[in-house]
């Protein structure tokens, strides 16, 4: 097998060019501005210029991809944190809702008991005192006022006829 003298000469020239090219580290290559890079590339072959520019572009893209991965991980962590907070809030609201439903059921039971009592009182007084189902019970508590006027007594005087005051209503 014989070696072609022309190809050997071309290989020797190529090696010399590679040896004469300034060696730039990856960090230095990425850190150069375009103007500085072009200054470093003067006098190099088009092939060497293309290779260095491609290497620089590859390194920069690698950096951009890494920063995107970091950003995506940070966003994912933030979204997980928000999700956990929202889940805790939903649980809290569900507990509050359940407690309010229990309270509402208890109040409905009391209302129905009061209506039953009002009906029994009205039935004992006669048909004229029957309670209309659409009436509303209003309970007002007030502190006795120390001013002039009649002092609050033990309640209305018992006499003939229906008792004054609001009538009970249907609970819904």
From Swiss-Prot:
Residues 145-172 have a biased composition (Pro residues). Residues 51-114 form the bZIP domain. One of its GO terms (molecular function) is DNA-binding transcription activator activity, RNA polymerase II-specific. GO terms for biological process: in utero embryonic development; regulation of epidermal cell differentiation; regulation of transcription by RNA polymerase II; skeletal muscle cell differentiation. It is found in: Nucleus. Gene3D superfamilies: 1.20.5.170. InterPro entries: bZIP, bZIP_Maf, bZIP_sf, TF_DNA-bd_sf, Transcription_factor_Maf_fam. Residues 79-93 are annotated as: Leucine-zipper. Residues 51-76 are annotated as: Basic motif. One of its GO terms (cellular component) is nucleoplasm. Keywords: DNA-binding, Nucleus, Repressor, Stress response, Transcription, Transcription regulation. Residues 140-172 are annotated as: Disordered. Disulfide bonds: none annotated. Since they lack a putative transactivation domain, the small Mafs behave as transcriptional repressors when they dimerize among themselves. However, they seem to serve as transcriptional activators by dimerizing with other (usually larger) basic-zipper proteins, such as NFE2L1/NRF1, and recruiting them to specific DNA-binding sites. Interacts with the upstream promoter region of the oxytocin receptor gene. May be a transcriptional enhancer in the up-regulation of the oxytocin receptor gene at parturition. Monomer and homo- or heterodimer. Interacts with MIP. Forms high affinity heterodimers with members of the CNC-bZIP family such as NFE2L1/NRF1. Belongs to the bZIP family. Maf subfamily. This is Transcription factor MafF.
């Amino acid at each position: 097998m014989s070696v072609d003298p022309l190809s050997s000469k071309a290989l020797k020239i190529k090696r010399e060019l590679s040896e004469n090219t300034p060696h730039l580290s990856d960090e230095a290559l990425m850190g150069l501005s375009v103007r500085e890079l072009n200054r470093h590339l003067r006098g190099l072959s088009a092939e060497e210029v293309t290779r260095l520019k491609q290497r620089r572009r590859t390194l920069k893209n690698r950096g951009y991809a890494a920063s995107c991965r970091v950003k995506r991980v940070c966003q994912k962590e933030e979204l997980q944190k928000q999700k956990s907070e929202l889940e805790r809030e939903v649980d809290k609201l569900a507990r509050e809702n359940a407690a309010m439903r229990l309270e509402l059921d208890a109040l409905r039971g009391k209302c129905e008991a009061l209506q039953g009592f009002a009906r029994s009182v009205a039935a004992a007084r006669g048909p004229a005192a029957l309670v209309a189902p659409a009436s509303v019970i209003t309970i007002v508590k007030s502190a006795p006022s120390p001013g002039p006027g009649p002092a609050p007594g033990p309640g209305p005087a018992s006499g003939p006829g229906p008792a004054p005051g609001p009538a009970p209503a249907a609970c819904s």
